[in-house]
């Protein structure tokens, strides 16, 4: 009988875990076709060379202040929040920031839609209204604004013919070179018979492509981006996905391309607290985007002083 082992999570605790598990990954409730690419489930080593230009996409969001709107006992909860999205383009040995954009939103629940005047020339909030009133519903709407911004940027760069690697699950359903990069695992899409292939991957190898998704059909695969001795079995393994609209042969080409090149972008523990899955271009971009949001305390003071000075127009 194998001896039990203990691992210390490589990620810093404030980011949760790279594998949200309770004894093992839960199985996805999606209907998965594991034989999209081949019936022989074994590790695949891409036979590629060269370094194609690639754009790495990510976004951030932040609640700047909580708020209420209304009169007497009839008040609607809301928030002021900032979102940002951008890209790092890596071409050969050079990298550059591309199109980093900041948006600021006021989100109010209960159908309330107060029109907010600009608090300053640099801090202007556009309005969103939702029927719900729970704090998580307000936050979800802010996150949707961030996702929309990321999606628009991903679509634009992919339409220009660039290889785009977007942090997180894929939402765009177009036949473009857009790859969703999922760095943490809450569930597995592999059966007990196929999961050992993913866990046994060497750096720069991938599983065969499998298909899933009724509403948003996708091709997906697992790949190991770095060695991870003495860590959880799923550490340093990422899942990637593309829309089925690209077609199987193009998906195979993208899977080989991404699998071959991702290891050179794996971060190191001394530099990033979510290493190695938090890729260096994405981690660099995150830091840039957070800086663009501005100091939270200063932004909150502008909001408070603006509201006190009558920064709200008629509802």
What residue spans do the PLM features occupy?
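Long, contiguous domain-sized segments
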Residues: 1-48, 52, 66-69, 94-315
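Short hydrophobic beta-strand that contains or immediately precedes a catalytic carboxylate
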Residues: 55-57
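Short acidic, Gly/Ser-rich segments with clustered Asp/Glu that frequently serve as metal-coordination loops
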Residues: 60-65
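Covalent nucleotidyltransferase core used to form phosphodiester bonds in nucleic acids
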Residues: 69-77
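Short beta-strand scaffold segments in enzyme catalytic cores
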Residues: 83-87
